[in-house]
Amino acid sequence: MDMHSGTFNPQDFAWQGLTLTPAAAIHIRELVAKQPGMVGVRLGVKQTGCAGFGYVLDSVSEPDKDDLLFEHDGAKLFVPLQAMPFIDGTEVDFVREGLNQIFKFHNPKAQNECGCGESFGV
C-alpha cells in the first residue's frame, strides 16, 4: 500500500491500538518535561530503507486533527490515522543496548526487517 495514494475508511477497521511499556512511558514523560510546550511524541512511518518502511518519531506541541492518542501513565503517543494500517498492534519499548538507549518497536504486522533494523515491510 502506498502511503500517499488510495483511501481507506477508519470504520472498516477494528484497531488493536498501540501500547507503551513502562520504560517507554517514563522516557516520553522525561522528554516532555525537558521541552516546554511539548505534550507528547508522534509515531509515524515513512517509505525508506531496504525493507520498505521506517518508523519516525517527532515531538508534538499540538496534535494534528487526524492523530489518534494512545496514553499510558501520563505519557502521550500520537499516531497519524494513515499510519495505523502499518503499525496497529505495535508495542513501543525503550531499551538500553550497550551504551545506547533507543526506542524499540515490536510490530506484529512487520513481515520482514532489514539487517540493520532500520526498516520493515508489511
Swiss-Prot record:
Task: Extract the SUPFAM superfamilies matched here.
Answer: HesB-like domain
Q: Which GO terms describe its biological process?
A: iron-sulfur cluster assembly; response to oxidative stress
Q: Which Gene3D superfamilies match?
A: HesB-like domain
Which sites bind [2Fe-2S] cluster?
A: C50, C114, C116
Q: What happens when the gene is disrupted?
A: Deletion has only a mild effect on cell growth. However, deletion of both IscA and SufA results in a severe growth phenotype in minimal medium under aerobic growth conditions.
**Highest taxon, organism lineage:** Bacteria
UniProt GO molecular function = 2 iron, 2 sulfur cluster binding; 4 iron, 4 sulfur cluster binding; metal ion binding; protein homodimerization activity
Q: Which residues bind [4Fe-4S] cluster?
A: C50, C114, C116
User: What InterPro entries does the annotation carry?
Assistant: Fe-S_cluster_asmbl/transfer (IPR050322), FeS_biogenesis (IPR000361), FeS_cluster_insertion (IPR016092), FeS_cluster_insertion_CS (IPR017870), HesB-like_dom_sf (IPR035903), SufA_proteobacteria (IPR011298)
Keyword field: 2Fe-2S, 4Fe-4S, Iron, Iron-sulfur, Metal-binding
Q: Name one GO cellular component term.
A: cytoplasm
Protein family? Belongs to the HesB/IscA family.
| Subunit record text | Homodimer. Interacts with SufB and SufC.
Q: What does this protein do?
A: Member of gene cluster sufABCDSE that mediates iron-sulfur cluster assembly under oxidative stress and iron limitation conditions. Binds [2Fe-2S] and [4Fe-4S] clusters by mobilizing sulfur atoms provided by the SufS-SufE cysteine desulfurase system and then transfers the assembled Fe-S clusters to target proteins including ferredoxin and aconitase. Seems to act as a Fe-S cluster carrier rather than a scaffold, this role being performed by SufB and SufC.
Database matches in PANTHER family: IRON-SULFUR CLUSTER ASSEMBLY PROTEIN, PROTEIN SUFA
This chain belongs to the protein called Iron-sulfur cluster assembly protein SufA
Organism classification, top ranks?
A: Bacteria, Pseudomonadati, Pseudomonadota, Gammaproteobacteria, Enterobacterales
> What is this protein's gene name?
sufA
